[in-house]
Amino acid sequence: MSVGFIGAGQLAFALAKGFTAAGVLAAHKIMASSPDMDQATVSALRKIGVNLTPHNKETVRHSDVLFLAVKPHIIPFILDEIGANIEDRHIVVSCAAGVTINSIEKKLTAFQPAPKVIRCMTNTPVVVREGVTVYATGTHAQVEDGRLVEQLMGSVGFCTEVEEDLIDAVTGLSGSGPAYAFTALDALADGGVKMGLPRRLAVRLGAQALLGAAKMLLDSEQHPSQLKDNVCSPGGATIHALHVLESGGFRSLLINAVEASCIRTRELQTMADQETISPAAIKKTVLDKVKLDSSAGASLSSDHVKPLP
């Protein structure tokens, strides 16, 4: 079995490194494509032995399982490009937030009457084999196709099959979840530094606290609230700290964050469906904006800003 990645960014690197570390796939059995062969993740993939190419069609030709690891709005253009190269043997796995199985199948059926499509949502901790992945199978994907993907993704963390209509919510929770955890950890470390701890030690203590708490929860059948209560002594330091969190709306902020991520995921699907702008146009628009902003900034600097004495 060979695996290909359309896109050679952070997700492709995380999965490729996870697969090779787990021993389920040798690096020479993996190929990734990117139009930018100078980006850092391309160099990182090359270092672990992954084959690289700037041509998406070459990745398709050398792959049995093909991961679409690009931004959602680019998916329609990628499918137009590679559709004619998709064969019966290919399992197309979309990792793009919000992009539905139906939208991918609709594109590919113009080239292949029964494309095997699987939609998944994973997260970056797959790089250390502690990821979370859910997947849903498409109209033409067989049971064994789903099992193959589950075997791959299960080698780099927890993996389970769900109904597709749950995947947007999963994106808001575990897909974006590592970013919530890193932000919380950064803030915890800042608190430690404020109270006198060295930065490196503060980060390590915070990370270990979160790791230990997660493991306690996964290894027990207790509700998170019960485990929280077990830490709080009457009149103690922890319950006073939790009062501060509750006063600041800590729970509501997390709930709202999950909701916001989920809603944005659905908006991304709408953008992908509209296909109103191509990747080349997006790149040109960004470059033009940078030039415009630079010119405006230079003008503002010369006309309105006096040099410091």
UniProtKB/Swiss-Prot annotation:
Highly expressed in osteoblasts and skin. GO terms for cellular component: mitochondrion. Pfam families: F420_oxidored, P5CR_dimer. It is found in: Mitochondrion. NADPH binds at A8, Q10, L11, S34, D36, N56, V70, K71, A97, N230. Pathway: Amino-acid biosynthesis; L-proline biosynthesis; L-proline from L-glutamate 5-semialdehyde: step 1/1. One of its GO terms (biological process) is cellular response to oxidative stress. One of its GO terms (molecular function) is identical protein binding. Keywords: Acetylation, Amino-acid biosynthesis, Mitochondrion, NADP, Oxidoreductase, Phosphoprotein, Proline biosynthesis, Stress response. The modification Phosphoserine is found at S278, S301. Homodecamer; composed of 5 homodimers. Interacts with LTO1. Oxidoreductase that catalyzes the last step in proline biosynthesis, which corresponds to the reduction of pyrroline-5-carboxylate to L-proline using NAD(P)H. At physiologic concentrations, has higher specific activity in the presence of NADH. Involved in the cellular response to oxidative stress. This is Pyrroline-5-carboxylate reductase 1, mitochondrial.
